[in-house]
Amino acid sequence: MSDYRVTLEAGWTVKDVESVQDAIGIAVSEAGKRLHPSAKFVDVDVMNMPCPYCGKEINTALVIARTGLVGLLLSMKVFKAENPEHAVHIAKSVIGRALRDVSLSTYSVELIEGDEIAE
């Protein structure tokens, strides 16, 4: 049995926003509130990707017609999983229970070495 850090990606919709920064702030806040009572150990971050023109890192957020779509990364440590697929299944179950109507997709799975567990 091994320990893993599982990161899932989610597309978060925010209504009635004027700017990308507002959409990001509201998305992170709403996700944090929904995760807090049952899964407060989940880290919430804004997803970044390289700009296709300059290669610089940009956030994955978009606002059209006062509706925002923000790419979020939700990561958690999963202890004593049988394999990476089992760790993903556990993470999706825990996070999915808190964020019922949000689609989740696997972003990354990393094996945690013995020293990193004590963080």
From Swiss-Prot:
Source domain of life: Archaea
Q: Which residues form a coiled coil?
A: none
* Protein's organism: Methanocorpusculum labreanum (strain ATCC 43576 / DSM 4855 / Z)
Q: What is the lineage of its organism?
A: Archaea, Methanobacteriati, Methanobacteriota, Stenosarchaea group, Methanomicrobia
Tell me what this protein is called: UPF0212 protein Mlab_0931
Which PANTHER family does the UniProt entry name for this protein?
A: UPF0212 PROTEIN MJ0068, UPF0212 PROTEIN TK1194
Instruction: Quote the InterPro entries the UniProt record gives.
Output: UPF0212
Which protein family is named in the record?
A: Belongs to the UPF0212 family.
